[in-house]
């Protein structure tokens, strides 16, 4: 059953970002075009990848899916069966992301699957595969540290300060200078991982400062003009700086003489604080921390891959059980038709005066011989071939029962 699964796609490693972005922009159009022509389709479309997952692709569907290749047909990735499933599980687990352990991709996989289900484009095979992929992605994140923390400079700045303070940032008095994306990232990383006592945001325009403070819900927050920093700096345990400009906002002597803040991390480019050993840290130290955090994630790749292989085995078991149930239903339908024919023959015999007991015995004997004949043919095939797949067994039994049922006529009231 897994052999029916296929993936055709491109990503930023095999095609240009511009090409992937164009495909992402029109992904719903591609989903409708391929979805209505195929047995089953799910398309994962992000800024990094455009991948079409198919159940039993036909030549037409393959041609449609191949249209996503870059000009010249380059960059197209094709995977089949268990390889396609393994790739999807790696995507959901964040192992194929630009940033290993990426959090967002799991939600992107979920939304892609749900969109196809909403349009009626999924099949039991695709539903099982995507359900297992989401479970795998969740397991990898909960049973490993591959997604712990962030790996951007904002997250690295927070991680560096927490390690330098020794006990982390719970209960700390924290200042953030700036209101741009980097400052927002610092606030998000800070209040996602830690629970500071108070967060004070200093900015030239306090209105924008509330965008930063808003990332620390449930924490006492202050937004103050930048010129208030000099008055309050000694009350802070840690200070983060992320602003544009080249003018120092703190005097070296003040930093060297002061007891607080114990740690200042400045990710501004260029830095706007004086470098003071052991107290003030700039981008080189933050870059080292980001590198360390990424290396920590990379250490968890073998554990993540082991989980993926476990879940692939579970997927194959689930698909095997599903296929067995489908085969069982198919064989039972064929048996029901055969039983119905015997029932009709028995009724005809009774109407023609056959003794009821004799009619039942004849019907049972006839049914047993016919089922036994089908089983005998199955055993002969197994002996000749040496091994039969589930599909072979189903095909032999269903075709044999259908042939017997077709030939089960009756003459002159005979039930034999």
UniProtKB/Swiss-Prot annotation:
Residue positions annotated to bind NADP(+) are 178-183
Q: What is its EC number?
A: 1.2.1.70
**Site location (Important for activity):** 87
User: What is any one GO biological process for this UniProt entry?
Assistant: protoporphyrinogen IX biosynthetic process from glutamate
Q: What protein family does this chain belong to?
A: Belongs to the glutamyl-tRNA reductase family.
Provide the function of this protein.
Catalyzes the NADPH-dependent reduction of glutamyl-tRNA(Glu) to glutamate 1-semialdehyde (GSA).
**What's this protein's name?**
Glutamyl-tRNA reductase
The species this protein belongs to is Aeropyrum pernix (strain ATCC 700893 / DSM 11879 / JCM 9820 / NBRC 100138 / K1)
What lineage is this protein's organism placed in? Archaea, Thermoproteota, Thermoprotei, Desulfurococcales, Desulfurococcaceae
């Amino acid at each position: 059953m897994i052999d029916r699964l296929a993936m055709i796609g491109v990503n930023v490693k095999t095609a240009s970002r511009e090409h992937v972005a164009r495909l992402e922009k029109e992904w719903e159009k591609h989903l409708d075009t391929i979805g209505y022509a195929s047995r089953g389709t799910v398309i994962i479309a992000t800024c990094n990848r455009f991948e079409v997952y198919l159940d039993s692709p036909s030549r037409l569907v393959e041609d449609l899916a191949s249209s996503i290749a870059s000009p010249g047909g380059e960059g197209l990735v094709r995977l089949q069966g268990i390889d396609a499933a393994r790739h999807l599980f790696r995507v959901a687990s964040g192992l194929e992301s630009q940033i290993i352990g990426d959090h967002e991709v799991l939600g992107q996989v979920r939304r892609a699957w749900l969109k196809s289900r909403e349009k009626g484009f999924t099949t039991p095979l695709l539903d099982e595969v995507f359900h297992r992929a989401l479970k795998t992605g969740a397991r990898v994140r909960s049973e490993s540290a591959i997604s712990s923390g962030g790996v951007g400079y904002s997250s690295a700045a927070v991680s560096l300060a927490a390690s330098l303070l020794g006990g982390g940032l719970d209960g700390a008095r924290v200042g953030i200078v700036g209101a741009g994306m980097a400052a927002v990232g610092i606030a998000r990383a800070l209040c996602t991982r830690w629970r500071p006592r108070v967060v004070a945001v200093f900015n030239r325009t306090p209105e924008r400062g509330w965008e930063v403070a808003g990332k620390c819900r449930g924490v006492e927050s202050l937004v103050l003009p930048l010129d208030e920093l000099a008055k309050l700096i000694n009350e802070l345990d840690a200070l983060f700086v992320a602003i544009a400009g080249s003018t120092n906002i703190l005097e070296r002597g003040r930093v060297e003489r002061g007891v607080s803040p114990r740690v200042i991390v400045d990710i501004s480019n260029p830095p706007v604080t004086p470098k003071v050993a052991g107290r003030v840290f700039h981008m080189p130290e933050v870059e080292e921390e980001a590198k360390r955090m990424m290396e920590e994630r990379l250490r968890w790749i073998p554990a993540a891959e082991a989980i993926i292989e476990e879940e692939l085995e579970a997927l194959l078991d689930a698909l095997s059980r599903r296929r067995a149930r489908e085969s069982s239903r198919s064989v039972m339908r064929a048996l029901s038709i055969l039983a119905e024919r015997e029932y009709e023959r028995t009724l005809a015999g009774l109407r023609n005066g056959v003794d009821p007991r004799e009619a039942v015995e004849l019907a049972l004997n006839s049914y047993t011989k016919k089922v036994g004949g089908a089983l005998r043919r199955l055993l002969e095939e197994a002996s000749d071939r040496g091994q039969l797949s589930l599909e072979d067994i189903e095909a032999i039994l269903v075709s044999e029962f259908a042939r017997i049922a077709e030939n089960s006529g009756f003459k002159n009231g005979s039930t034999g």
